[in-house]
Amino acid sequence: MTAQLQPYQREFIEFAIDEGVLKFGEFTLKSGRISPYFFNAGLFKSGRALARLGRFYAQAIAHSGLEADVLFGPAYKGIPLATTTAVALADHHDRDLPFAFNRKEAKAHGEGGNIVGAALAGRVLIIDDVITAGTAIREVMQLIDAAGAEAAGVVIALDRQERGQDENGLKAQSAIQEVTSQYGMPVVSIVTLDQVLAYLETRQSQGDESDQSLRQHADAIRAYRDRYGVRLDG
């Protein structure tokens, strides 16, 4: 089944490629796997790029129907992501939400503590780039629980749909599916790997000479997903 693309999702994929955030080729991951693509949200590194990125996060939130009282960005990459998402929600969706982030180490002086910005109260929506192992999300859940708040969900840029590995081999679920199962909360992504693949296949079918190399990238991503990934419903 072809993954359906909303117009904003197609624009996001093109934006990520143009900014050098989404690359195709051969990349060795920390796990030792050779991936046919690489996604590094840290390369959204200009004011204009970050502002536009926030609008994509805001569109994903609006499209998902998720409701929240506070946005939270896990240190470090999540900090600018939550900030730009809060600005975009206020400017483009008339939703003026407070936001917060954590310090890696609690401050002993001044007000102290490890939360900066708004108090964690009510429904907290976590904003991050990707979920690889789920470790950062589990740490955030401890902060949310300690504050007496509840997690409304997680919003990320890309769902890699990739299964981790343990001593028994490939896990049955992706890291995102594990987080969803463990905490019973939704994880929303601007795009999924299936949608990136659908985008490549669409470009390839248009037959532009400049897009001929996309065929091999699409084939490589499909093979990688079939080996290490999970299929999503719908």
Curated annotation (Swiss-Prot):
Residues annotated for orotate binding in this entry: F38, F39, T132, R160
Keyword Magnesium appears in the UniProt entry: yes
CDD domains reported in the protein's UniProt record: PRTases_typeI
GO cellular-component term (any): cytoplasm
E.C. code: 2.4.2.10
Entry-linked SUPFAM superfamilies: PRTase-like
One Pfam family this sequence matches: Pribosyltran
Binding site for 5-phospho-alpha-D-ribose 1-diphosphate: 30, 76-77, 103-104, 107, 109, 128-136
One GO BP annotation of this record: 'de novo' pyrimidine nucleobase biosynthetic process
Catalyzed reactions per annotation: orotidine 5'-phosphate + diphosphate = orotate + 5-phospho-alpha-D-ribose 1-diphosphate
Domain of life: Bacteria
Molecular function as annotated in GO: magnesium ion binding; orotate phosphoribosyltransferase activity
Entry keyword annotation includes ATP-binding: no
Keywords: Glycosyltransferase, Magnesium, Pyrimidine biosynthesis, Transferase
Cofactor: Mg(2+)
Coiled coil: none
Pathway entry: Pyrimidine metabolism; UMP biosynthesis via de novo pathway; UMP from orotate: step 1/2
Class of enzymatic activity (EC top level): transferase
Family the entry assigns: Belongs to the purine/pyrimidine phosphoribosyltransferase family. PyrE subfamily.
Function: Catalyzes the transfer of a ribosyl phosphate group from 5-phosphoribose 1-diphosphate to orotate, leading to the formation of orotidine monophosphate (OMP).
Record protein name field: Orotate phosphoribosyltransferase
UniProt organism field: Chromohalobacter salexigens (strain ATCC BAA-138 / DSM 3043 / CIP 106854 / NCIMB 13768 / 1H11)
